[in-house]
Curated annotation (Swiss-Prot):
Protein name: Protein BCAP
Annotated function: Acts as a suppressor of ciliogenesis, specifically, the initiation of ciliogenesis.
Protein family: Belongs to the ODF2 family.
Main location: cytoplasm
Biological process, per Gene Ontology: cell projection organization; negative regulation of cilium assembly
Keywords: Cell projection, Cilium biogenesis/degradation, Coiled coil, Cytoplasm, Cytoskeleton
Organism whose genome encodes this protein: Homo sapiens
Disulfide bonds: none
C-alpha cells in the first residue's frame, strides 16, 4: 500500500511538471531558419522522451493486465472457498485501491503525453515547413477520422476529446504568434530532460516495486489456486460422502422394512401359537373343571358315605350296648331267679318238712314261674340272635363300604394325579404364556429401540441435510458476491478500455507526429502494440464471457443441487412418514394384542370366579343335604 501511495505521488509530481513546461512553452517563438537544426534535435529528444513515456504506459498496461487475472483468480477462489471471506474482502479492497491509484497514474501519464503532443504541434506549426506539415496533417487527419469513427462506435467520450483537440489547435495557432526564441526553448528542454531523467529513475524504482508486487500477487494467485483445488476436492469428497450416506440410508431403510416384515410375520406366528395355546388351555381348563366337579361330587359322596358309616357304627354300638345291657339284665334276672330258686328250694325243703302238700303247690307255682322265665329268656335269645344277624349284616355292609371307600380312594388318587397333571399342564401353559408375553415385551422393546435408533439416524441425516442447506445458502451468497465482484471487474475493465482507448488516441497522435518526422518504423511498432492491446482486450472480453458462462454453469449446478436436495428431502420426509406409520401400526397391533390378552385374562378370571361361586353353592347344597340326612335319622 505504501508503494502504491509513493507511485501516485510521483505521477502527480510528473503531471505538475509537465503543466509548468507547457505554460512556459506557450511563449512566442521566432521562425528563423537558423534554429531548425536545434528544433530537430529537440524533436529527437522529445521523441526519446515519448518513447520512454510510451514504455511507462506499456508497463502500466502490463501491470493492469497482470492485476486482472489476479482478480479472476480471487473470483474463482471466492466461488469455492467456505471461510476467510473477510480476509478476501480486505485483499480485494487493497487490490482495488492499488488499481485505482495505478489508473490515476495512468491518467496523469496520459495527460502528460497529450501535453507533450500539443507542445510538439506548437513547435511544428512554428516551422517554415508548412507545406510538408499540411500534407502530413491531412493524411494524419484522414487516418484520425477513420480511427475516430471506430472509436465513436465504441464510446462517446472520444467526441469530446476531438472537440478539445480542435480547440487546442486553435490555441496553437494563437500560441505560434507568441513563440519565443529557439535558444530559450532549447535551454528549457535541457532542463526538462534532466528532470525527466530523474523522473525516469523514480519510475524505474516504481517499476521494480511493481514487479515485486506482481511477484507477490502471482504467489498469492498460486496459493489461491491451490486452495481452490483443495476446496474442490473437499466438496467432491463431501458429495461422495453424501451419496454414500444416502445409499447406506436406503439400505438401512430396506433392511428396516425387511425386519418389520419379519417381525410382523413373527407376531402373526406367535398370535397363531397363542391362539392354539389358548384353545388348548381352554380345553384343559374345561377338562380340569369337569374333573374338579367330579372330584367335588365324589368328595360329597365320600363325605355322605362316611357320615352314613359313622351313623351305622353308632347304631351298632348302641345296639351292642343295648344287647349287652339286656344280656346283663337277663343274667342278673337269671341269677336273681336262681338265687330265689335256691332260697325257694331251701324254703321248700323246710316246708316239706313241715307241710308236704303246700310244697307241691309251691313247686307247681315255681315251675310256672320258671317256665315264664324260660320263655322270656328264649324270646330274648331270639332277639339276641336277630341282633347278631343284624350285626353280621352291618359288618358285611361295613366291609362292602370299606371296599367302596378303597375304590373311591383309588379313584381319588387317580383324580388327584390327573389334577396334578392338569395343574402341571396349566403351569406349563402359564409359563408358555408368560414366555410369550415376555417375548412380546422384548419384541416391543427391540422395536422401540430400533425405532429410536432410526429416529436418531433420521435426525442425524436431517442435520446433515440442514448443513448441506447452509452450505448451499453460503454458496449462493458467495455466488452473489462473485457476481457483484464480476460487475465491479466489468466496470474496471470498462475503465481500462476507456484508458486504453485514450492511449490509442495518444498513440494516434504520436503516430501523426512520427509521420511528420518520417518515423514509419516506430508507427508500425505502435500499431502492433495497439493491435496487441486490442487482442488483449478481446481476450479480456472472452475471459469475462467465459467467467460469465462459468457463473451461469455454477448457478445451474446450484439450481440442480437445490432440486436434488428438495427431492431428497421429500424422499426422506416420505420415508420418515412411512416409518412413523409402520411404527404406529406396530404399536396398534401390540396394543390390540395386549387388549386381547387382557380381555382373555379377564374372561378367564370371570369364569374362575363363576366356577368358584358354583362350587360354593354346590358345597352349600351338599352341606344342606348332609344336614337333612343327619336330621332324618335323628327324627325316628
Amino acid at each position: 500500500m505504501e508503494k502504491a501511495v509513493n507511485d501516485g505521488s510521483h505521477s502527480e509530481e510528473l503531471f505538475c511538471h509537465l503543466k509548468t513546461i507547457s505554460e512556459k512553452e506557450d511563449l512566442p517563438r521566432c521562425t528563423s531558419e537558423s534554429h531548425l537544426s536545434c528544433l530537430k534535435q529537440d524533436i529527437l529528444n522529445e521523441k526519446t522522451e515519448l518513447e520512454a513515456t510510451l514504455k511507462e504506459a506499456e508497463l502500466v498496461t502490463h501491470s493492469v493486465e497482470l492485476l486482472l487475472p489476479l482478480f479472476k483468480d480471487t473470483i474463482e477462489k471466492i466461488n469455492f472457498e467456505n471461510a476467510n471471506l473477510s480476509a478476501l474482502n480486505l485483499k480485494i479492497s487493497e487490490q482495488k485501491e492499488i488499481l485505482i491509484k495505478e489508473l490515476d497514474t495512468f491518467k496523469s501519464v496520459k495527460l502528460a503525453l497529450e501535453h507533450l503532443l500539443r507542445k510538439r504541434d506548437y513547435k511544428q506549426t512554428g516551422d517554415n515547413l508548412s507545406s510538408m506539415l499540411l500534407e502530413n496533417l491531412t493524411d494524419n487527419e484522414s487516418e484520425n477520422t477513420n480511427l475516430k469513427k471506430k472509436v465513436f462506435e465504441k464510446e462517446a467520450h472520444i467526441q469530446e476529446l476531438s472537440c478539445l483537440f480542435q480547440s487546442e489547435k486553435a490555441n496553437t495557432l494563437k500560441a505560434n504568434r507568441f513563440s519565443q526564441s529557439v535558444k530559450v526553448v532549447h535551454e528549457r528542454l535541457q532542463i526538462q530532460i534532466h528532470k525527466r531523467e530523474a523522473e525516469n529513475d523514480k519510475l524505474k524504482e516504481y517499476v521494480k516495486s511493481l514487479e515485486t508486487k506482481i511477484a507477490k500477487w502471482n504467489l498469492q494467485s498460486r496459493m489461491n489456486k491451490n486452495e481452490a483445488i483443495v476446496m474442490k476436492e473437499a466438496s467432491r469428497q463431501k458429495t461422495v460422502a453424501l451419496k454414500k450416506a444416502s445409499k447406506v440410508y436406503k439400505q438401512r431403510l430396506d433392511h428396516f422394512t425387511g425386519a418389520i416384515e419379519k417381525l410382523t410375520s413373527q407376531i402373526r406366528d406367535q398370535e397363531a401359537k397363542l391362539s392354539e395355546t389358548i384353545s388348548a388351555s381352554n380345553a384343559w381348563k374345561s377338562h380340569y373343571e369337569k374333573i374338579v366337579i367330579e372330584k367335588t361330587e365324589l368328595e360329597v359322596q365320600i363325605e355322605t358315605m362316611k357320615k352314613q358309616i359313622i351313623n351305622l357304627l353308632e347304631d351298632l354300638k348302641k345296639m351292642e350296648d343295648h344287647g349287652k345291657n339286656s344280656c346283663e339284665e337277663i343274667l342278673r334276672k337269671v341269677h336273681s331267679i336262681e338265687y330265689e330258686n335256691e332260697t325257694l328250694n331251701l324254703e321248700n325243703t323246710k316246708l316239706k318238712l313241715r307241710f308236704p302238700c303246700r310244697i307241691t303247690e309251691s313247686k307247681n307255682m315255681n315251675i310256672l314261674i320258671v317256665l315264664d322265665m324260660l320263655c322270656y329268656i328264649s324270646s330274648e335269645k331270639t332277639t339276641l340272635a336277630a341282633l347278631k344277624d343284624e350285626v353280621v349284616s352291618v359288618e358285611n355292609e361295613l366291609s362292602e363300604l370299606q371296599e367302596v371307600e378303597k375304590k373311591q380312594k383309588t379313584l381319588i388318587e387317580m383324580y388327584k394325579t390327573q389334577v396334578q397333571k392338569l395343574q402341571e399342564a396349566a403351569e406349563i401353559v402359564k409359563s408358555r404364556c408368560e414366555n410369550l408375553l415376555h417375548k412380546n415385551n422384548q419384541i416391543t422393546k427391540t422395536k422401540n429401540k430400533n425405532v429410536e435408533k432410526m429416529r436418531g439416524q433420521m435426525e442425524s441425516h436431517l442435520k446433515e441435510l440442514e448443513r448441506v442447506c447452509d452450505s448451499l445458502t453460503a454458496a449462493e451468497r458467495r455466488l452473489h458476491e462473485c457476481q457483484e465482484s464480476l460487475q465491479c471487474c466489468k466496470g474496471k475493465c470498462a475503465d481500462q478500455e476507456h484508458t486504453i482507448r485514450e492511449l490509442q488516441g495518444q498513440v494516434d497522435g504520436n503516430h501523426n507526429l512520427l509521420t511528420k518526422l518520417s518515423l514509419e518504423e516506430e508507427n508500425c511498432l505502435i500499431q502492433l502494440k495497439c493491435e496487441n492491446l486490442q487482442q488483449k482486450l478481446e481476450q479480456m472480453d472472452a475471459e469475462n464471457k467465459e467467467l460469465e458462462k462459468k457463473l451461469a454453469n455454477q448457478e445451474e449446478c446450484l439450481k440442480h443441487s437445490n432440486l436434488k436436495f428438495k427431492e431428497k428431502s421429500a424422499e426422506y420426509t416420505a420415508l420418515a412418514r412411512q416409518l412413523e406409520a409402520a411404527l404406529e401400526e406396530g404399536r396398534q397391533k401390540v396394543a390390540e394384542e395386549i387388549e386381547k390378552m387382557s380381555s382373555r385374562e379377564s374372561a378367564l378370571q370371570i369364569k374362575i370366579l363363576d366356577l368358584e361361586t358354583e362350587l360354593r353353592k354346590k358345597n352349600e347344597e351338599q352341606n344342606q343335604l348332609v344336614c337333612k340326612m343327619n336330621s332324618d335319622p335323628e327324627t325316628p
